[in-house]
UniProtKB/Swiss-Prot annotation:
Pathway: Cofactor biosynthesis; thiamine diphosphate biosynthesis. Forms a heterodimer with ThiG. Catalyzes the radical-mediated cleavage of tyrosine to 2-iminoacetate and 4-cresol. This is 2-iminoacetate synthase. It comes from Salmonella typhimurium (strain LT2 / SGSC1412 / ATCC 700720). Its EC number is 4.1.99.19. GO terms for biological process: thiamine diphosphate biosynthetic process.
Length: 377
């Protein structure tokens, strides 16, 4: 059975880098006038040459976003269930080598978090854990997902890569979507940053979206950790290749792309390639032109000013008031966090800022009486 690994083996990192850097102003203009972007068009929009065309790129991205999603922007919040991790990764605050306090939420803790989150108004929840199969694996999910699911309209997960059979079971437990980020698509650089644990297996992670697609998960999230490799443009292009593969082979699923830039954390590394804010806007808008129908998400890793200015252009899914540590909504203990969020504003403040720009914050776009995609497909 073919997976994205087959396509990945056809892609040469240095060749893609040279092709992107070789794009000209004429290539960018051609891409801007294309009804549907080709791979070459995307390379042009990710290239240094596109920097001078940021305004027309953003204008077209905004038009496409409004045509597809109207003025709506969906809100979600992450719920961190555990910071236990069996991996040693250079860039993550949860890494097993970091001497931080560890915590896994029990039934009482989870209910306190759910109560606190519901008071904030959120209905869409992203469940996050460190990667620890023994203590925060399927047994843990079987025990606690039913309780959480009853209280929220939509549940998504960002946990360790699992088997196709596990994902099929999670679907029956009420999971609507799974986010899995490759971190970097450069195999050698990936190995430099993943020193111990199951996460060292580059291809197990690379093929996770294929397993999600075969399991029939409704929404699949893709992305790279921008700045981990020495060329963010190539990594972002590889995310696009992964997206195109998934859309072709698992067309029944919906897709989401996120753009996390490397943020400070305990024991963390400095970015190997720096993407500035204009380049992040360029990349987000390029993805909107490539795939007008997908969800583009922007988290609290970015500053309030940046989010307020970029969300109206091409973003249709945002987090707010995120706590990146287990138990953070009921009891805020920053020493447990995975990374330090940049936008710490309360959700109503973020919503007001977007409403002032003519956007409509959406806290809930599904109800249990309608049935769930995870149950009816």
């Amino acid at each position: 059975m073919k997976t994205f690994t087959d396509r990945w083996r056809q892609l040469e990192w240095d060749d893609i880098r040279l092709r992107i850097n070789g794009k000209t102003a004429a290539d960018v203009e051609r891409a801007l006038n294309a009804a549907h972007l080709s791979r070459d068009d995307l390379m042009a929009l990710l290239s240094p040459a596109a920097a001078d065309y940021l305004e027309p790129i953003a204008q077209r991205a905004q038009r496409l976003t409004r045509q597809r999603f109207g003025n709506t922007v969906s809100f979600y919040v992450p719920l961190y269930l555990s910071n236990l991790c069996a991996n040693d990764c250079t860039y993550c605050g949860f890494s097993m080598s970091n001497r931080i306090k560890r915590k896994t939420l029990d039934e009482v803790d989870i209910q306190r978090e759910c109560d606190a989150i519901r008071k904030l108004g959120f209905e869409h929840l992203l469940l996050v854990t460190g990667e620890h199969q023994a203590k925060v694996g399927m047994d843990y999910f079987r025990r606690h997902l039913p309780t959480i699911r009853r209280q929220f309209s939509s549940l998504q997960m960002e946990v360790q890569p699992l088997s196709q059979e596990n994902y099929a079971e999670l679907k029956t437990l009420g999971i609507d979507g799974v986010m899995v980020y490759q971190e970097t698509y450069h195999e050698a650089i990936y190995a430099q940053h993943h020193l111990k644990g199951k996460k060292q297996d580059f291809f197990w992670r690379l093929e996770t979206p294929d397993r999600l697609g075969r399991a029939g998960i409704d929404k699949i999230g893709l992305g790279a950790l921008i700045g981990l490799s020495d060329n963010w443009r190539v990594d972002c292009y590889m995310v696009a290749e992964h997206l195109l593969w998934m859309q072709k082979h698992y067309w029944q699923s919906r897709y989401s792309v996120s753009f996390p830039r490397l943020r400070p954390c305990t024991g963390g590394v400095e970015p190997a390639s720096v993407m500035d804010e204009k380049q992040l806007v360029q990349t987000i808008c390029a993805f909107r032109l490539l795939a007008p129908e997908i969800e583009l998400s922007l988290s609290t890793r970015e500053s309030p000013w940046f989010r307020d200015h970029v969300i109206p252009l091409a973003i249709n899914n945002v987090s707010a008031f995120s706590k990146t540590q287990p138990g953070g909504y009921a009891d805020d203990h920053p020493e447990l966090e995975q990374f330090s969020p940049h936008d710490a504003r309360r959700p109503e403040t973020v919503a007001s800022a977007l409403s002032a720009q003519g956007l409509q914050p959406v806290w809930k776009d599904w109800d249990s009486w309608l049935g769930r995609a995870s149950q009816t497909r």
